[in-house]
Amino acid sequence: PVHLENDANCVGLSELLAHPEIENAACVVIGTGIGGTMIINGKLHRGRHGLGGEFGYMTTIAPAEKLNNWSQLASTGNMVRYVIEKSGQTDWDGRKVYQEAAAGNALCQEAIERMNRNLAQGLLNIQYLIDPDVISLGGSISQNPDFIQGVKKAVEAFVETYEEYTVAPVIQACTYHADANLYGALVNWLQEENQW
């Protein structure tokens, strides 16, 4: 038998596999766009239309950039596009942006800080929307400890600046990083076959 599931939902299922003690969690998958899922009371929350956790569709206000959702504003894909537009060079990818930033490239540092700030805003929205035990970040970029640290620092900066934020989200990398959707697909299959 074959069972299908949304890839971001599979990431959430993989976190249930790795951390069965977690009751409430959000998983945010960052790549060319942003995907996500919610775990509520230890179960995947799909919502009425199957859109539960589709955080990338959260509306943002960035009229100067003509971007209207979090996926367009805060993804790795947008970070790379920003560097391409500002530099006029097309041979960029996320890994190169981080390498050049570490070597002192001011444009790449700016692009990363911009992405981190935009991610932090969305992560704080998620924190105050569902109050999860943890928010796990996935996608290939989650393997980069500098990325995780940068996002945490951006969240901390918002929390320190605005006294209304009394709780900061617990942020971590997805346990299985870029392979999380594969492990989650296995969990989905086992659940559908009543073996989990």
Explain the meaning of each model-derived region.
Residues 15-24, 60-196:
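ATP-binding/phosphotransfer module of carbohydrate and carboxylate kinases, centering on a glycine-rich
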Residues 1-68, 184-196:
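Phosphate-binding/catalytic loop of phosphoryl-transfer enzymes
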